[in-house]
Amino acid sequence: MLKLVIGLMLVAGQVSGPGGALPQVLHPDFKSASPVKAGKRAEVIISFTAIKGYVVDRELPFTLKLTEVPGVTLEKTEIAASGKDPKAKDNYYVDLPTLKVGITAAKAGKYEVPGKLKYFFCNKADGFCSTQTLDVKIPVQAE
């Protein structure tokens, strides 16, 4: 029984990596294509940067699931990135995708649209790969 417990602890330690948690591999950046005007459709563009030494798989799902908030209407609540990357020679992005979110704010004000970003990444140094889900909040400033 003791050997089983020790074995499980070793496996759990290897899966979680040093420090016990995976690093946040992608960092989103949110920009609106134009000023967000109340009552008018606008587009928020989400671009990403990856931390050095990690790559993101372009053949596995890269999705953003959003939750509507009062005062903001979303064109879509689920957005998937295209796996196309002309520079890629394998199944990893060279140029990370951008996601476009169509929104309409009912009235002027500040809003935050929550969502979950899900993607698959690999560490180039040791070959460790995993799915990661991030909580994101899209800031919206409507005039």
PLM region spans:
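Sec-dependent N-terminal signal peptides
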Residues: 3-13
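Extracellular/lumen-exposed scaffold segments
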Residues: 15-143
